[in-house]
Amino acid sequence: MGGMGGGSSIAGVLSAFGGAASGISEIPEIFRIAASACTGPGHYIFQLYEWLCIQVERVPFHSIVAGRPEMWKIGVFYVALGIRYVWSVGEARDNLERKGIFLFPKEWNAPGKNSVFIAVAVVFLVVQPVHGFQSWFLDVGQGDGVFLRTRDEAILSDCGSSQDKKIGKNVLEPFLKSQGIRTLDWILVSHADADHTNGIEWLLKEEADIRVRNLALPAAGKGQEAYKKLETLARKRGAEVYYLHRGETVRAKSLALRCLYPEAGETPAEERNSHSLVFDVTYGKFRMLLTGDIGVEDERKILAVEEDKKREKVTLLKAAHHGSNGSSSEEFLECFSPAFTVLSYGEGNTYGHPAPEAVERLEQTGTEIWRTADSGAVNVWTDGKRMYIKGYKKQDYGKKRDKKQIKN
């Protein structure tokens, strides 16, 4: 009651100041300063409340990240809860027990057993086992955001948007929490353009619920202010920071992530796209290329050292630079021959992505193209032998759910 009384007192003070300001504002111009003086305290009290709420949100473990359970689990939970309730209080239980029929052990009717039952049911609802390898190409508008997950690791590769400046709060945070993610083992930054990083910056600055263990940046960008900023933010969160180049690998238990680009010792280019990190990700027979925003010249450099891989087809390609005409060259596509390609871009973007010429080159390879602007987030699942791919917008939900054998 004391807390309520305190709240009522503050509300009364705010009302008094507001009423005074309203009355004074009806008086001629010279009294407007007095009205401002009356509204000022209320404004600052609200600011104090907002600041206190923000500080509480930054306290570690102030909330539990449980994830979003599947619909069938929610259904089972409520059915079990209903049966347990009816059995606890209903006449049906008494009639059956007289006949020696027990739906639940007798001990379950002891005081406190309902709490145990509910606790077990909640654990069933919250625990979300991960099977195989899943990739999500997030619907971030004009930008990139890829999330990789196995039973052993959670990895974010880029997250940014030039169409939504609050992509971290609006898309990244809700998505990660819906998956029950409390720790990101790696954040991979292909390059430091805002349409690949502003969501990551927000996460490192504002999101205290999600721990970040490691941050990978392109070696060719070391020393540039944009990368220094990301490095500083990550280290403040207790993360290790690595600058990677071709030939290095990302430590992961279930996945193999090999860096194909940039070259070691490459001079930082003013155009960040050309030193994007490129990763070859493999899980069993499934193989995926994450290409950042590399251009045709960068693709040629990769091809020059990937001759031995030409016979190994790529299952899925994240098309470079949102489908720009300056990427996805004919030689590159012919070399890796992807079965599926994801184009990440925003509808109506000012860059004209994807370029019709790039789309035509992709279509000529026979690849199946998925577009985040059309399908929303694109989800790919594989057990290393089979896979499926689906979109999350209404017209695509459930499409391509049939598992296909992976061919190399």
Regions found by a protein language model. Name each.
Residues 3-408:
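Non-globular, low-confidence helical/coil segments that flank catalytic cores
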